[in-house]
A protein has these predicted regions:
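Short acidic (Asp/Glu) patches
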Residues: 96-100, 128-137
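Single, function-defining residue in the core of a domain
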Residues: 1-58, 66-67, 79-86, 93, ...
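Conserved beta-strand elements of the Class I
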Residues: 112-114
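Short Lys/Arg-enriched helix C-cap and helix-to-coil transition segments
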Residues: 90-105
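Short edge-strand/loop segments of extracellular domains
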Residues: 70-72
Length: 383
């Protein structure tokens, strides 16, 4: 089922349907598959999930009053017991199940535009949690954070996929590769757009081997190091060069004969060639340079074809990446992700995936309401 953009009520029904679909995967969703949510009680599965999604910055007791009203109010301990019956994977499954129903209405020349970015989420102080606690400055109180990596539809305002990492094990590039892998069988024409924190031959290799298109901003030093040839490489103010980079792990005579050969050390990730292997890989892409101010330039690496995506189009596509930054701001503040309640790690994961689902639900409804206004030309004005 995909959403009818003219029926906001159906979006809520579809969310409820996605929540109830967790009963079909009890083993991966419930901590006690045979007994969890098997009896009719004051707090149902739907109410448990919706409470976690919509909880704001108040105490659990205050949030329960807002959610249920003062009549037939359950206790905070009863809600916690219900949440304990759910695995954090249940909320991830809900997020993906609900999101996958969405129609991709807006495209760029037939392509779905997907931004990749990460953001830190502040958590309640808990020095005993090694997963999220870190001491940033010696002698001062530490903080608790997790790193949220997401793929985001830049034109349709939807978070498509996400991966959470502890602050000590943060690896944005590794998360990008895993998220890429989960999109390769989507059946859609897609372009992945990311900032210079994702400049990596491993990422380029994953996209190229998956036959996926990408556009990634890179630091000047990275761009200039990509071609081991004449010094005039990227010397002009505006450049659009097509190059092949040969990747390997050993400095052999055979490899040295390859044009533009790059030998990667053991410490550098490249998932397609094991350290010590004689194998090589060839990656083909474009490197672009253009001015953005006086003595200031942007560098882009992409495998988009030049005939269909000239320089001006590349600039236009990259500028759309800022929609992802805006979405994170709304997710954290309007979506209350800055008000995580729990110290328990499983509950943290529940709340973060619940807020991602709430963001997408709100985006679907806003899009549907906007579509209705366009078609009816009836607008409500607040005076």
């Amino acid at each position: 089922m995909q959403y009818n953009p003219t029926a906001p009520g159906q979006i809520r029904e579809s969310l409820i349907s996605s929540i109830n679909s967790l009963f079909a995967c009890k083993k991966t969703s419930f901590n006690s598959p045979d007994t969890a949510f098997s009896r009719t009680r004051k707090i149902s599965l739907v109410q448990t999930v919706l409470f976690v999604m919509t909880a704001g910055s108040g105490t659990v007791n205050n949030e329960l009053v807002d959610f249920y009203g003062e009549n037939s109010l359950p206790t905070a301990s009863a809600m916690i017991q219900r949440r304990n019956q759910l695995k954090p994977e249940a909320f991830r499954e809900l997020f993906l199940h609900f999101t996958q129903k969405a129609q991709i209405l807006k495209k760029f020349r037939g392509y779905q535009l997907i931004g990749a970015d990460g953001s830190r989420v502040n958590l309640p102080y808990n020095p005993s949690d090694a997963f999220s606690h870190i001491n940033c400055i010696q002698g001062r109180k530490g903080i608790n954070q997790v790193h949220l990596n997401t793929f985001y539809d830049l034109l349709n305002d939807i978070f498509l996929d996400a991966e959470l990492q502890g602050i000590r094990e943060m690896d944005e590039k590794g998360a990008f590769c895993r998220l890429l892998g989960r999109q390769k069988d989507s059946g859609r024409k897609q372009i992945f757009i990311a900032d210079r924190g994702y400049a990596s031959y491993n990422i380029f290799g994953h996209a190229i081997h998956n036959k996926q298109l990408f556009l990634i901003r890179v630091p000047a030093a990275f761009a200039e190091s990509m071609y081991k040839g004449p010094k005039h490489w990227l010397e002009k103010e505006t450049e659009d060069e097509s190059i092949t980079v040969h990747i390997g792990r050993r400095r052999t005579k055979k490899n040295a004969q390859l044009q533009n050969y790059h030998c990667l050390s053991k410490s550098r990730h490249y998932d397609f060639i094991e350290p010590g292997s004689d194998n090589t890989d060839a990656l083909q892409f474009r490197v672009l340079k253009f001015p953005i101010g006086e003595d200031s330039y942007e560098y882009i690496v992409t495998n988009l074809p030049k005939y269909a995506f000239p320089l001006q189009t590349i600039k236009e596509l990259y500028n759309l990446r800022w929609n992802h930054e805006v979405a994170y701001r709304y997710l954290k503040y309007a979506g209350n992700m800055v008000h995580i309640h729990s110290l328990k790690r499983d509950f943290l994961f529940q709340e973060i995936y619940a807020k991602l689902t709430l963001y997408n639900f709100s985006s679907f409804v806003a899009s549907a309401v906007g579509d209705i206004k366009k078609k009816t030309k009836k607008y409500t004005y607040v005076l």
